[in-house]
């Protein structure tokens, strides 16, 4: 069974490609567990999140409260992404 990969591309000749993992409510809002995102070189994790919200406006619901992880380590929104990095979008998880 082939897995469909969602790609979001930005028009720029000098770019990096990263894998974005979506968890919990972010996954529900987008309908995808992961995707490939092409961004200009030097982009921050915040710029990546901005691009995701443009593609999936419903993510605005969780944008202000997500935690970002870059290559399995929590990070800030000013971290620079590199080619083949993995960016996780982790909304708060509630339950009982």
From Swiss-Prot:
Biological process, per Gene Ontology: auxin-activated signaling pathway; Mo-molybdopterin cofactor biosynthetic process; molybdenum incorporation into molybdenum-molybdopterin complex
Q: Which UniProt keywords apply?
A: Cytoplasm, Molybdenum cofactor biosynthesis, Nucleotide-binding, Phosphoprotein
**Listed GO cellular component terms?**
molybdopterin synthase complex
Residues annotated as carrying 1-thioglycine in the record are: 96
Gene Ontology terms for molecular function: molybdopterin synthase activity; nucleotide binding
Q: What is its main location?
A: cytoplasm
Q: State which pathway it belongs to.
A: Cofactor biosynthesis; molybdopterin biosynthesis
- The protein's name: Molybdopterin synthase sulfur carrier subunit
Organism whose genome encodes this protein:
Arabidopsis thaliana
């Amino acid at each position: 069974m082939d897995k469909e990969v969602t790609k979001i591309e930005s028009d720029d000749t000098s770019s990096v490609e990263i894998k974005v993992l979506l968890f919990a409510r972010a996954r529900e809002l987008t309908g995808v567990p992961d995707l490939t995102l092409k961004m200009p070189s030097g982009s921050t994790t915040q710029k990546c999140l901005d691009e995701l919200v443009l593609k999936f406006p419903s993510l605005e619901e969780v944008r202000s409260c997500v935690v970002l992880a870059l290559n399995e380590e929590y990070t800030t929104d000013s971290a620079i992404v590199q080619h083949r990095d993995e960016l996780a979008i982790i909304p708060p998880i509630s339950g009982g």
